Amino acid sequence: NGNPITNHFLSFDRSHYEIEKYEPNPDATEWVIDMIITDNEAVSVHSALGQLGYDVSITRQTHWEISVEDERESILQKIDATGELYNSNKEFINEITTADNTASFLVRQKDDMRSRAKFESLTERFEIEKISELKRGVIWNVTVNSGNLDAILKHILNTHILFNPL
């Protein structure tokens, strides 16, 4: 039939990840953004985990860490007025979700291209000076409705549905 066939095993070792306790930069301002409208990405993750048999609730928040050199309030007001970091028609600044049986995971990209682009836009297009650093991440809030919290969280993290370990 012309198709070469070999008899061997394939193996793949996933890279291991470490969960670190998040320590906010004391010199930075955190903005936690919630959505007014339905978050389709969180709904999809919730649905996929439900199909895997997990009785959990999922919400997602966007996390911005904004470092400025001085004039913090003035700079933050300018950033807010641009609408670059969130769309005030669909989103609003809130607090990190806290609830019983809930764990929150801040996930950041290794190459944070989105925050780099927003930083350039704020400093060049909007000419806001004194922004020293901008970091973006996603906070996944996982509420375990039934079962052992730690065991279920470990299983969910091992699915890599909340982040790409590579």
Predicted regions and their residues:
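Non-catalytic terminal accessory/regulatory regions of metabolic enzymes
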Residues: 1-166
